[in-house]
Amino acid sequence: MLKTIIFDLDDTLYSYSDLNEQGIKKICKFTCKRLSLKENEFYEAFNKAKKDVKEELGENVASHNRLLYCQKTLENLYKNPFSISLEMYEEYWTYILDNMKLNEGVLQLLEFCKKNKIKIGICTDLTVHIQHRKIRKLGIDKFIDAIVTS
């Protein structure tokens, strides 16, 4: 008898990839407007920032932190990294959280597991803070028995 099932969160229980792309576009629009930049200037700085953060930190949880990408983007643009990095970060996550939807059949599967006393775990990357926010926003926190994040 199955006792436990473990799921990834992003691109398993909900579709993350498209939201991520749109979230980055939201950051771009916000940053370009605030700093009078062209989109290509933003994307050049942002892509370099993401690459640099991953090279500097390796594959650990901090290397996924969008606030670091935003801060480094501003540094790459020779702007004060404290000027709007937090606002950029909030633009991104507000968009993601406001637009997430469970994939078809996920709620029914989680309900089935609970009804049949199957423990549910989440094993995922990104920071624990944002993963908790996502789980609550998706309304599935009542189903989850354990979470492991990177």
Please annotate each region the language model reported:
Residues G23-C28, F46-K50, C70, Y89-W93, ...:
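Hydrophobic alpha-helical core bundles mediating ligand binding, dimerization, or RNAP-core interactions
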Residues K33-K38, L77-P81, G139-F143:
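Short helix-capping segments at alpha-helix termini
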Residues K48-E90:
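A metal-dependent, Asp-based hydrolase signature
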Residues M1-F7, T12-A45:
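Active-site neighborhood of HAD-like aspartate-dependent phosphohydrolases
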